């Protein structure tokens, strides 16, 4: 047991170190894609452009990484412009690395089959822009106040993944201290929480340097948003699929006591758990289960969501699972999920939650059912067409066999010739 725990701890440390190195390497590889253009070498030589000998790389990403790590062009110049030739095959040099003093020194001209990338080296490091996020203090949770943690979004080729693991049993006792404060926090407002998840629509690759996202602009007065750290995934991705907005009403108007400890649904990872207690909302996404206090990172996951809401004063939980939620796209584009929280004073039973989800799923259900009559009518038509073709083929085969048999029977039948036939035949022979 000891060796198994030690081995898993070592394996987790190795994975974290590997991802940290990949993250550190990817932060220096911010680039701007330029399709079907190439540097005008003749006019750029007099303006200070420098370059190395072309090399062979299997993919464009390898060429970009090679440019990011190359800092010895003409002695001490760092590569900031690269060209990848997609027309080269059979391990021929296809990656060209250059150093451009400025953008005006490297004029471009159109060229089919060549992809150019401008490496942005003066972009500020993302780790310095990410503020240290702490949970709100006890005095900031008074009525009329709210705390909010805003993390700036990187402007180019960055994918944000979800936080790894947040547990109520770890966060609440450490940050808020006593059960008296929990009672004061839960009894401040008996309102319902409405969660709006906005997903950013995918943009083209040329317009990916954009302004920062607007985050959480519909916050209530008595809401505490629990921030979570943001991990940066692999760079150089192209675009993100647009996601529809989803309304997740939580119409639970109860007052749990301070001694209740809500627990997350412990299913096999990966699991996404949304635990809602008025007036606070915690969104946590668990991918893998780490050993001790280490947080494990995962690559991709098919998410299952569980909604939990307190139902009585003793802290018992009602679990309403729902399986249809917008697919979270990880490390495939510029995706960031800003969360907006709004409070309302509408009280209803927990059964309204299931009704709202059924209503939300009704529109895609109707659209999918609209295609059923076409399939039902299309299948018999194809069936009759196949039967008709088969019948026509059999009929033509029978006709051909009849004609062939008639010809064969006539050729084998012995004819009776008359004297006139012999006379005519003799005349033709004489001629």
UniProtKB/Swiss-Prot annotation:
Organism of provenance: Macaca fascicularis
UniProt cross-references to InterPro entries, sorted A to Z: MANSC_dom, MANSC_N
Protein name: MANSC domain-containing protein 1
Compartments (UniProt record): Membrane
Keywords: Glycoprotein, Membrane, Signal, Transmembrane, Transmembrane helix
Domain MANSC, residue spans: 33-117
Regions of this protein lying in the Cytoplasmic compartment: 409-431
Biased composition (Polar residues): 250-265
GO terms for cellular component: membrane
Stored PANTHER family: LOW-DENSITY LIPOPROTEIN RECEPTOR-RELATED PROTEIN 11, MANSC DOMAIN CONTAINING 1
Residues the record marks as carrying a glycan: 31, 222, 251, 327, 352
Superkingdom, taxonomy of origin: Eukaryota
Signal sequence coordinates: 1-26
């Amino acid at each position: 047991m000891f060796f198994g725990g030690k081995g898993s701890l070592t394996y987790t440390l190795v994975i974290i170190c590997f991802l940290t190195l990949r993250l550190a390497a990817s932060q220096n590889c911010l680039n701007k894609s330029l399709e079907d253009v190439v540097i005008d070498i003749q006019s750029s030589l007099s303006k200070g452009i420098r370059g190395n000998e072309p090399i062979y790389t299997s993919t464009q990403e390898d060429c970009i990484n090679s440019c990011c790590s190359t800092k010895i062009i003409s002695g001490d110049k760092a590569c900031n412009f690269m060209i990848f030739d997609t027309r080269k095959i059979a391990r021929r040099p296809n990656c060209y690395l250059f150093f451009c003093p400025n953008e005006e020194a490297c004029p471009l001209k159109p060229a089919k089959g060549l992809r150019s990338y401008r490496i942005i080296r003066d972009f500020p490091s993302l780790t310095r822009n990410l503020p240290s996020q702490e949970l709100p203090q006890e005095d900031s949770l008074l009525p009329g106040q709210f705390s909010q943690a805003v993390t700036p979004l990187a402007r180019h080729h960055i994918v944000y993944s979800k936080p790894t693991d947040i547990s109520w049993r770890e966060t609440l006792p450490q940050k808020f201290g006593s059960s008296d404060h929990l009672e004061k926090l839960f009894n401040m407002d008996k309102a319902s929480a409405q969660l709006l998840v906005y997903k950013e629509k995918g943009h083209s690759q040329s317009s990916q340097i954009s302004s920062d996202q607007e985050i959480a602009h519909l916050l209530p007065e008595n809401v505490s948003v629990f921030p979570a750290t943001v991990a940066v995934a692999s760079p150089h991705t192209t675009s993100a699929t647009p996601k529809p907005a989803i309304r997740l009403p939580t119409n639970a108007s109860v007052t749990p006591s301070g001694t209740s400890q809500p627990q997350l649904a412990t299913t096999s990872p990966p699991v996404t758990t949304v635990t809602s207690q008025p007036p606070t909302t915690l969104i946590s996404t668990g991918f893998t289960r780490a050993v001790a206090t280490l947080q494990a990172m995962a690559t991709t996951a098919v998410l299952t969501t569980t909604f939990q809401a307190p139902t009585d004063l003793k802290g018992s939980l009602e679990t309403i699972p729902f399986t249809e939620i917008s697919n979270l796209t990880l490390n495939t584009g510029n995706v960031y999920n800003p969360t907006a929280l709004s409070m309302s004073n509408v009280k209803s039973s927990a059964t309204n939650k299931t009704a709202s989800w059924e209503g939300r799923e009704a529109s895609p259900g109707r659209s999918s059912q609209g295609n059923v009559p076409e399939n039902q009518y299309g299948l018999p038509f194809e069936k009759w067409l196949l039967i008709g073709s088969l019948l026509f083929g059999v009929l033509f085969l029978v006709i051909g066999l009849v004609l062939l048999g008639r010809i064969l029977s006539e050729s084998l039948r012995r004819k009776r010739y008359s004297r006139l036939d012999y006379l005519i035949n003799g005349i033709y022979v004489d001629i």
